[in-house]
């Protein structure tokens, strides 16, 4: 019984210190969307080149 309380207390202490900085889910989503947007923008010239090569190859 005491061992369980000690483990629980240690878990609470570790969790309290680890969550000192709250995790903002909307900020993480915003970063993921920005990375996706930047990847699409940077892939644009390559996609145009492949499309042009395909149209040249097909006729």
UniProtKB/Swiss-Prot annotation:
Subcellular localization, as worded in the UniProt entry: Secreted
Organism domain of life: Eukaryota
Pfam families linked: Cecropin (PF00272)
Serine amide modifications at: 58
Propeptide: 21
Family from the record: Belongs to the cecropin family.
The protein's role, per its UniProt record: Has antibacterial activity against Gram-positive and Gram-negative bacteria.
Protein name per UniProt: Antibacterial peptide enbocin
Naturally occurring in which organism (per UniProt): Bombyx mori (Silk moth)
Origin organism lineage: Eukaryota, Metazoa, Ecdysozoa, Arthropoda, Hexapoda
